[in-house]
Amino acid sequence: MKQIGLRVDVDTYRGTVEGVPKLLKILAKHQIQASFFFSVGPDNMGRHLWRLLRPKFLWKMLRSNAASLYGLDILLAGTAWPGKKIAKDLGYLMKQTLNAGHEVGLHAWDHQRWQAKVGRWSEAQLTEQVKLGVDALVQAIGQRVTCSAVAGWRADERVLAVKQQFGFDYNSDCRGTHPFRPILPDGTLGTVQIPVTLPTYDEVIGIQVKDEDFNQFILDKMKNSQGVPVYTIHTEVEGMSKSTEFATLLEMVHQENIQFCALSHLLPENIQRLPVGRIVRSEFPGREGWLGCQQEA
């Protein structure tokens, strides 16, 4: 049976309150354990609207029919009013996710600010953002945070160095092909990385595939994937407007003898045997701006 890591990104307040319970129900029905990464601070995702001035982002929003896909409340969150604190109000859902047998990790304190400003933040600012997120998630789940996946895959060597002090068991901060040990700025090796290898819905819809053909498209990608495959879904998409389609995909995956699992299950017993690599800034198909991408050492 082929194993594929299933990563669930929770970016927004509504994605938490509506998408998480629905996905927990769907995953329980199929007896699947996944890795959930929560945004825990203010939901300011609506402040991404200024990026509509950038052609690549505008095209992404148009081809994915973002208003219908996400809903206006998500697209406008934190614009005309302060963003609601997610973990403060909804921390019980993070604890519920953990109690359901899933891995729970940190995505971001402020998802929008991380994507917009991480490349310019000082070391102190980076540290503050991660610490705010870790502290809020610890408060919500009542135990240490074992894993993390930065917002929008916006990570480079500076980010990795800052995250070392938080003692995560693994990170999933980049796009790539297989788990590896990243080289830090001082030449030492950092916490193991488990890259996302497969495309997300919003990266390919309207470019490589029509909406009605997406399930077969991504299933074919899974069947043909090499390395150590990892697939990312979002509570705002697969847990809401596309939840029916996602449930159908799980049935298709099962018929192909593919099993989804939490990301930590993809690691070998001895991580010292993993290859060494780097995370570098790079453009990525279907995304606007730079992402952290795996590079062989």
Swiss-Prot record:
It catalyses: 4-deoxy-4-formamido-alpha-L-arabinopyranosyl di-trans,octa-cis-undecaprenyl phosphate + H2O = 4-amino-4-deoxy-alpha-L-arabinopyranosyl di-trans,octa-cis-undecaprenyl phosphate + formate. This is Probable 4-deoxy-4-formamido-L-arabinose-phosphoundecaprenol deformylase ArnD. The keyword 4Fe-4S does not apply. The gene is arnD. Pfam families: Polysacc_deac_1 (PF01522). NCBIfam families: PRK15394.1. Residues 2-261 form the NodB homology domain. Keywords: Antibiotic resistance, Hydrolase, Lipid A biosynthesis, Lipid biosynthesis, Lipid metabolism, Lipopolysaccharide biosynthesis. Coiled coil: none annotated. The keyword Lipid biosynthesis applies. SUPFAM superfamilies: Glycoside hydrolase/deacetylase. Catalyzes the deformylation of 4-deoxy-4-formamido-L-arabinose-phosphoundecaprenol to 4-amino-4-deoxy-L-arabinose-phosphoundecaprenol. The modified arabinose is attached to lipid A and is required for resistance to polymyxin and cationic antimicrobial peptides. It comes from Photorhabdus laumondii subsp. laumondii (strain DSM 15139 / CIP 105565 / TT01) (Photorhabdus luminescens subsp. laumondii). InterPro entries: ArnD (IPR023557), Glyco_hydro/deAcase_b/a-brl (IPR011330), NODB_dom (IPR002509), Polysacc_deacetylase_ArnD (IPR050248). The lineage of its organism: Bacteria, Pseudomonadati, Pseudomonadota, Gammaproteobacteria, Enterobacterales. Belongs to the polysaccharide deacetylase family. ArnD deformylase subfamily. GO terms for molecular function: hydrolase activity, acting on carbon-nitrogen (but not peptide) bonds, in linear amides. One of its GO terms (cellular component) is membrane. HAMAP family: ArnD. Pathway: Glycolipid biosynthesis; 4-amino-4-deoxy-alpha-L-arabinose undecaprenyl phosphate biosynthesis; 4-amino-4-deoxy-alpha-L-arabinose undecaprenyl phosphate from UDP-4-deoxy-4-formamido-beta-L-arabinose and undecaprenyl phosphate: step 2/2; Bacterial outer membrane biogenesis; lipopolysaccharide biosynthesis. Its EC number is 3.5.1.n3. One of its GO terms (biological process) is response to antibiotic.
